[in-house]
């Protein structure tokens, strides 16, 4: 899609779906992780080695290379489906894609990690990147809120990016409502759907996404890291 570099700040409908007082699953997990680090001074291995660029995404070179080529050629899709087992980098890849598209020095396949947009995305506080837990926000009302939010242009980034984890948990009614947005998305919108059970995602949704299958990471690849 063509980027939309600016939009009205503080539009009343922008944060209907994900207000700060009710973060999605990933938001709550991120807050808990950072609190644990502050209290104990210990950072789990998974957190210390969470990839921040496509080059750091171990075991998924086929995904990294294809997404890198798409960004370099300016052929970014409106919707992606990342499927595979838990803990193989689906959400990390979605965040890296978000940083790549909205980095102040991009779009780039190597986000700088230090600009305001990159930092806010990494800390899950970007106004233009929404991380949504499909298991907790699975009903048609939540998707209607999302569709309302989509109408507003980005606050200060090129793209508004919606990362929906466990998307297969959405109800049929929610899928049908989401389909209407996928059929004619605004040029500044990118969806990234993550799932451990791609077969449960409705074919009408899958057919409108670029599907990336994440492999189980081998022990030797983890040890090498």
Regions found by a protein language model. Give the residues of each.
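Extreme N-terminal basic, low-complexity initiation segments
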Residues: 2-11
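P-loop/Walker A NTP-binding region and its immediately flanking N-terminal helices
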Residues: 11-211, 215-223
